[in-house]
Amino acid sequence: MRIFKTSVLVALLALLIANAGFAQSGNVVQGKYFDIYYDDCDLTEVASKLSAKYFLHIDVFSQDSRGSDIKSIIGQLFDSIYLEVSDILDIHMYSFKGVISIMPNKVGIHDILSAYMTEPPDVPAFYFHERNTVYVSLADMNLGILSHEIAHAIIDKYFVVTPPAKVQEVLAGYVEYSIRKSTGTLPAR
């Protein structure tokens, strides 16, 4: 019994050490709903890729926020995306807290997925349920992709019994479609 307890303790300690830098390396922006971690990323590029003009929930250009730095603007922007996705899903969890990790490109995404899959898919972003973390490639980031993954995070935390994967994809796809339609970024027919 003592060997078992020691083995479990060592395994947990190793897991904690290994996970310490998994999503929380580098710089951080703290928002109300997300802690946003980034390495080798220009936050002005992040803001420009997410078209801040669209959001009803953000007021970064108000008199009070003109002196704000880019980190507070990014925090407000991601909070606004969360609120917009919540409105589309009609799921409002004001106590929600998640993590977003911005990787410079798909290589970072691939490296994380490689630790869990033998042949990881080539994706620009994904939501990792066990860590309540959205991973997104800055090179491929757009409002639709990020909204889709945030929808997965909301769906995952809202339902007591998580819906099947296909149902989650339909809901997240609807969010992405709604955002892209509202911003005029749907592909031409």
Name each model feature, range by range:
Residues 1-9:
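Bacterial N-terminal signal peptides that target proteins for export
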Residues 128-147, 159-163:
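Short pre-active-site segment immediately N-terminal to the catalytic Zn-binding motif
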